[in-house]
Swiss-Prot record:
It catalyses: 1-(2-carboxyphenylamino)-1-deoxy-D-ribulose 5-phosphate + H(+) = (1S,2R)-1-C-(indol-3-yl)glycerol 3-phosphate + CO2 + H2O. Belongs to the TrpC family. It comes from Acidithiobacillus ferrooxidans (strain ATCC 23270 / DSM 14882 / CIP 104768 / NCIMB 8455). Keywords: Amino-acid biosynthesis, Aromatic amino acid biosynthesis, Decarboxylase, Lyase, Tryptophan biosynthesis. SUPFAM superfamilies: Ribulose-phoshate binding barrel. Its EC number is 4.1.1.48. One of its GO terms (molecular function) is phosphoribosylanthranilate isomerase activity. Pathway: Amino-acid biosynthesis; L-tryptophan biosynthesis; L-tryptophan from chorismate: step 4/5. It holds the Pfam family IGPS. This is Indole-3-glycerol phosphate synthase. The gene is trpC. The keyword Aminoacyl-tRNA synthetase does not apply. GO terms for biological process: L-tryptophan biosynthetic process.
Length: 263
């Protein structure tokens, strides 16, 4: 685990204690019982790919540790609607407050504003957070292999499956990929950002792609900024793309999405 990821996870453990003190698991489970059924995240991705189109998971992100504030004019409702109107298959919403200036309320607001399934983009380390994701309206969660043991990955995936939540499992290298492939989820995310050097290279996805069984869905993440990169990845067989910063830095995120993938 890299220094920044270790720092984030350590802070997340402290935050988790505070959250559990404010709202116990039994209360959280009672809240989940009152929520509407999840939207089909995997189905939305598969449907777009079946049409021969890229499945774009469009991200709503205000800030990051590496870039600072990315978007000052930040309204998750209008951004979600803009993405939905310009071809996004799903949304990803940052909910980590300390490092990404995200919020659970942003996810709830974005989901209510459009019909798309929504991924909770956060650092999930405990089953409590899976129940929490379901309670705030998420349809999918992220599991980062670099931050979790095999036993933790399997436990968190099992909890997600019991709640009908999709799982996007994220890897950075071949060793992490082999661990991810032990899980049942079809969604394999390849993060092109090297957490040690903080550079992004789509070659990371291209290098790992041949190791992934065809029945899995490859989601390439981070650093996709040009139509040439999209064309290269599509030609290699990548069907799904998680993109955020490239859209968030523009005046009209939906237009940027359409230009990058569909014009």
């Amino acid at each position: 685990m890299t220094d920044i990821l270790q720092e984030i996870i350590a802070h997340k453990r402290e935050e988790l204690v505070e959250r559990q003190t404010r709202l116990g698991l039994a209360e959280l489970q009672a809240a989940v019982a009152l929520t509407a059924p999840p939207r089909n995240f995997v189905g939305a991705v598969r449907a777009r790919m079946a049409q021969g189109q890229p499945a774009v998971i469009a991200e709503i992100k205000k800030a990051s540790p590496s870039a600072g504030v990315i978007r000052e004019d930040f309204n998750p409702v209008t951004i979600a609607q803009d993405y939905a109107a310009h071809g996004a298959a799903c949304l990803s919403v940052l909910t980590d407050e300390h490092y990404f200036q995200g919020a659970d309320l942003y996810l709830a607001a974005a989901r209510e504003a459009c019909p798309l399934p929504v991924l909770r983009k956060d650092f999930c380390i405990d089953p409590y957070q899976v129940w929490e994701a379901r309670a705030i309206g998420a349809d999918a969660i992220l599991l980062i292999v670099a931050a979790l043991s095999d036993a933790e990955l399997q436990s968190l995936e099992a909890t997600a499956q019991s709640l009908d939540l999709a799982v996007l499992v994220e890897v950075h290298d071949a060793a992490e990929l082999q661990r991810a492939l032990k899980l049942r989820t079809p969604l394999i995310g390849i993060n092109n950002r090297d957490l040690r050097r903080f550079v992004t290279e789509i070659e990371t996805t291209l290098k790992l792609l041949p190791e992934i069984p065809r029945e899995r869905i490859v989601v390439t993440e981070s650093g996709i900024r040009s139509r040439e990169e999209v064309a290269t990845l599509r030609a290699a067989g990548v069907g799904a793309f998680l993109v955020g910063e490239a859209f968030m830095r523009t005046a009209q995120p939906g237009d940027a999405l359409q230009h990058l993938f569909f014009d």
